Amino acid sequence: MRMRKKKNLLPRMEACSSLLVADPRALRGRWRELLPDARELRVELGCGKGRFTAETAAAEPDVLLIAVEKVPDAMVVAMERAQAAGLHNVFFVDGDAACLPEFFAPGEVDRIYINFCDPWPRSNQKKRRLTHGNFLQLYRRVLPLGGEIHFKSDNDKLFEWSLDEIPRFGFRLSQVTRDLHAGSPVGVMTDYEAKFYQQGVTINRCVATMVPWEAPAEAEGEKA
């Protein structure tokens, strides 16, 4: 579903400009200057309208959260949400997952959130999946050993495919569940997730921890 174009997009973006990092490459290796006492730096890939972003940042004020979003009409809503909440530990970047090594130095990111990404269901689209081996190798370039990927999806086929793909690229799976909110809600939800929960849709979730791994000569995720 395409998001409607937001009215007055540019003025709204300018009103939240203090939260937008215009040149993320200039902060590569220096992100913690934005929050010197931060105990962790985390990245959210595709923040959408920012419910998860704002609530996570509010719950953990000593965590520096960088929300990466390529759709301006979504990002402006997320920025307005964060600004209205008076948050000082969250910043926004116009970009996507492929840019992470350009934005962040090796080992600079402690955790990556991937929430309800596009499943790209056709076989010829699999390289676009954010849990594809090509992306996993990019994440390895910015995470330290022990760094984590937190992955949530309502798409069962994508989740099962990802459970097979992720360990092949040097990540250890844990906290695997196919019904995260069984009984009662668990953790911070995204906007979509809250709707899914109300509709009775089950949510899949896992944590992937980076471990030592030696890439094959031509490592590439090729599971269909």
Q: Which residue ranges define each predicted feature?
A:
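Conserved beta-strand/loop positions that form the S-adenosyl-L-methionine
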Residues: 45, 68
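S-adenosyl-L-methionine
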Residues: 1-43, 51-60, 79-106
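A short glycine-rich, Lys/Arg-flanked "PGG" loop and its adjoining helix->strand segment in the class I
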Residues: 131-145
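Conserved SAM/SAH-binding beta-strand->alpha-helix loop
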Residues: 71
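Class I S-adenosyl-L-methionine
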Residues: 158, 164, 169-224
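Conserved glycine-rich SAM-binding loop
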Residues: 48
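Conserved beta-strand signature within the Rossmann-like core of class I S-adenosyl-L-methionine
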Residues: 146-153
